[in-house]
């Protein structure tokens, strides 16, 4: 969990080459990602040539900071294979999911090995195909920049757990989720206080109502009014 929560998107890199063993381990992490029916339709292109990295940065909508990363990994999918097993859904959806799962594994592995990485999804697809020699039956999905980080970005703001967590059906919020996982939440504490107050108020009302009914009943028996 620490690796997940401390990972950051790195866009500044030191001018230090990466040990190829670490690059290989990062790619191995991508290959460990799940795929539908274990079809393993992902493909990985490791780019370290300076000129080609400059071309990739240009194709990624002129994100020139990418050139400083000594390694780019282009994650592609073999859409012919995806379609062969799962038809149009495999070609249009599963293939994208597989590349995304591989990319996330690789980002975490990079962080584990002390490397910085960033997920790039904005690029000219045809330009990327040309630069990396991607055949027509394959499609580039994600580019990951990789290198030793030259920055430590702060943790970006995130919504609290119960904001987007539902139980059983969409929109049914899990208001006690943080209590279940022992994670304090001001929102949950507020709900607990409100619930206790409502119970106390309800109890007091019931007691008062019971006393009134008792007085009324006693009055009927004795003919006295309280």
Predicted regions and their residues:
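Acidic, surface-exposed loops and disordered segments
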Residues: 1-226
């Amino acid at each position: 969990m620490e690796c997940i929560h401390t990972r950051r998107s790195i866009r500044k890199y030191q001018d230090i080459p990466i040990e190829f063993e670490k690059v290989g381990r990062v790619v191995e992490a991508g290959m460990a990602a799940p795929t539908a029916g274990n079809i393993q339709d992902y493909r990985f292109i490791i780019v370290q040539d300076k000129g080609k990295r400059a071309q990739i940065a240009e194709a990624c909508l002129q994100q020139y900071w990418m050139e400083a990363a000594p390694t780019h990994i282009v994650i592609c999918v073999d859409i012919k294979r995806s379609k062969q097993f799962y038809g149009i859904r495999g070609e249009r959806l599963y293939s994208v999911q597989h590349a995304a799962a591989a990319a996330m594994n690789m980002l975490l592995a990079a962080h584990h090995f002390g490397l910085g990485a960033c997920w790039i999804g904005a690029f000219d697809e045809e330009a990327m195909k040309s630069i990396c020699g991607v055949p027509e039956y394959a499609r580039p999905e994600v580019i990951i920049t990789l290198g030793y980080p030259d920055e430590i970005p702060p943790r970006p703001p995130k919504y609290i757990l119960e904001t987007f967590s539902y139980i059983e059906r969409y929109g049914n919020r899990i208001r006690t989720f943080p209590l279940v996982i022992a994670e304090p939440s001001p929102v949950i504490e507020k709900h607990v206080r409100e619930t206790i107050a409502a119970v106390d108020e309800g109890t007091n009302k019931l007691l008062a109502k019971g006393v009134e009914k008792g007085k009324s009943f006693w009055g009927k028996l004795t003919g006295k009014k309280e």
